[in-house]
Amino acid sequence: MGLAAVALPILIHLFTRARAKPIPFSSLRFLKQLRNQKIRRIKIRQILLLLLRTLAVLFLVLGFARPTCRTQSGSGARSRTSAVLLLDNSASMALEEQGESLFAAAREAGARIIELMQPGDELYLCTTTDTLEGTERRAFHDFQAFRRRLEATPLSFRATDISAGMRFAQNLLQSAHNVNKELYLLSDMQATGFAADSLPAREFNPRQYAVPLLASHPANLAVTGVRLRSAILERGKTVEVEVTLANSGQEPGRTKLVQLFIHGQRVAQRMVSLERGTTAQELFRFIVDRDGWIEGYVQLEDDALMEDNLRYFTFYVPERLNVGVIGERTAGSELLQLALQSSADSSAFLRLFTVVPERSFGLAIDSLQLLLLHDVSRLPDAVVERIGAWHSRGGGIILVLGRRTDIGWYNARLAPVLGLSPVLAAFGEGGHFSLGRVDGTHPVFSGIFEGAEIQFARPQFNFACRVASAPDQHALLSFSTGDPYLYEVRRDEGALLVFTSSFEPEVSDMAYRTIFAPLLHRSISYLAAHGQNRGVELSAGEVLRYRLAGQELQKQLEIHRPDGGVDLVHPGITASGAWIDHAATGIPGLYSLRADGKRLAVWAVNIPARELDLRRAERELVEDSHHLHWVDDPARIDQFIREERIGREYWRELLLAGLLLLLLEMALYREKGELPSEEESQEMRRGS
């Protein structure tokens, strides 16, 4: 009925005009032409005024009618809704923008979504860091309880996986029974949180919305890595630690202070400056004044994201090494033991357990840090299997091949278990050859040679084993023939050093050279450091694993957490031994395993490196690959949802347009000098 008012201006115009018979006046024809031109302009203006008045009334009527443009998803707007709030609670959400963290902004956006829920609706809460907790699977019908649950959800230091979180949320919605199904992703849209492949569309077609919580220009430097550069660790010696820094913010680099702490004491510091989007490695040196487990951390000055300014590390400086030696009682074996016990320091540092191959059954291999096999002919199969299992857990091995070595047995049994290349043949019988190339850059030679030049008396050989080359072989010493004399095979599970000629006097004079004892000691220290410091750095959420020795099974085992808490743990018995598995590693810091108070192992748990990359995902890619609708203004998320559910109302725009047209009509009507006189009005009425 309101639209009928649109006709009022037209009816007034039609019924108020007067009709008069024109009387031509010949003497004023020229003046009439001028007058007609003016009247024509006035009539055009009146038509415009009529059009403006008509449109103004039309827009005002439509505005009061509150027209709504319904979306495709709004068909079931009055039906009950099942919604999932997928909350990004990763460490990057702690980034502060104008004094408020992105995580707090995400909670506020979630609270506005809760206010739109009606009786009969249900809500689920999931996080992008852990979607496996049973408490996250139940639906909330009490929205106040859901709000409390949302406010109580803490930040997590685990890696975020938005794609996995969306799949989990979709599974929850698929099992829900309400007609409307909605998914809200509250996140900083970190690029590393999205999988490279697309998320498959679901048949039930839930409405999925991305609510981006973004910082405009954050200034942030991060410690993304700490790596132990020193391969040989000894008390009283210099240790090198490499620290990786990254400018993950949006502002150019500013000078920041980086400090390195050992057992709470600052031992090194440096000023650094990085440009936006760049990384750098800084090398810190300090002297370690104790043995055992060394605990440390690297700290940056405060910035927009505090959580990535601290990174922990740990390493082990051997106190005393248990070294097992398997070999026949020969002159070479005696020279080997003399070299290992050549000083008071080494005799206190090394504890040797020597057995012949026939009695190798009795060697407690699990209690060793290093095993040396010298010119062994054969070993029992059971001993070979024990050695292989021990090596796979990080045990270091020095293997010396010689004339007594049964090449057939070695190629068939020992080499496959240890992952070594087979021996092709023996060479050098009846002749003499010496050493050739030396890789002086390897850590084993650190401290042996003075200066850049490598000079030492080269030993002579008349027998050696030629081994097949392999990609994982690295030659430290080579014969003049080019064949390796000492080579390394290093893998994640353990390292080996292989000598292809024995220390027997009838084979070589290596045992009489000055390089012999230092080379053995450095080799043992190198392998021991590799074995003890393997797997000591983990990411938050990963499992701590430790294999217990037999004598530790009856002791009280505890995991000491960074927050001061203590967890009692119990070993699990498997075919490979007794293991401690501890998964409660959600807090960054240093975790230690203790048996009756004695520390057995220490782990450094840090925020995953990929979580420190603050680059945002590209909007177009995310919308296409994950079927998300982008919410441009998270502060008005409630209005956005209402429009998506019910449709968009345009009454504000229509009323505003009507008022603007009325103002334009008033300005045009009162334009100076354009109001017609009474005579002109009568003339226009007669002309019309």
Q: Residue spans of the language-model regions?
A:
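Short beta-strand segments of immunoglobulin-like
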Residues: V226-L233, N533-E537
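Membrane-embedded catalytic interface detector for glycan/lipid assembly enzymes
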Residues: V356, R490-E493, T500-V507, R513-L662, ...
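Juxtamembrane linker/hinge segments adjacent to transmembrane helices in membrane proteins
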Residues: M1-L62, H629-E644, R670-S688
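Short, charged loop segments at secondary-structure junctions
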Residues: M93-E96, E133-A164, L213-P218, V317-N322, ...
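Enriched for extracellular/lumenal, surface-exposed ectodomains of secreted and cell-surface proteins
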Residues: L186-S187, E295-E307, F503
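Acidic, S/T/G-rich, low-cysteine, solvent-exposed domains in lumenal/extracellular/periplasmic regions
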Residues: A191-A210, L321-G324, A331-H530, L553, ...
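Von Willebrand factor
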Residues: G76-R137, R147-R149, A164-L172, N180-S187, ...
